[in-house]
Amino acid sequence: VSGDGSVRVPVVRNAIAAAARARVAVTIPGTKVIELAAVGTPCVSCTAFNAPELITINGPLTYLNRIPVAGAAMKRAVVTRYARRFTYHTQPNMDAERELVLELRGTLTPGRVARVALERLDDAAWLEQRSQALTGLYREHVGASVRMAAGVLALQQAV
């Protein structure tokens, strides 16, 4: 947000590098939340139930809404029941067993999401605390791909 109140949203090629420089990110549950946590970017994750029949879920149930007449109602019921089973919807929160990523759930409006994101953006203590906690959560995994590749190369050379 610039001084005159206008909002600039850049188009970037390397999203995670841009996210690492962001003060806060707004996203949906998924791999991006883990990536944001790894670089220490606090985020607000949105699980909108405005149209639960359109939510993508793993496995064949994702296509349930395509069944004529009753499919959408069945998928709505399955998605809302499934969502209630879990305390958290984002992997960092599941791994930490506490809320590090702010999760918004339910019927969401752009205004509500923006209001919450702006409140967090103005809360320097929250931003700092969440950034440190998220960075620490996956610290031991930093460099895992390099270690794995080195292990594979060592095995190949041993053969």
What kind of feature is each model-predicted range?
Residues 1-159:
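Nucleotide-activated sugar donor-binding and catalytic core shared by glycosyltransferases
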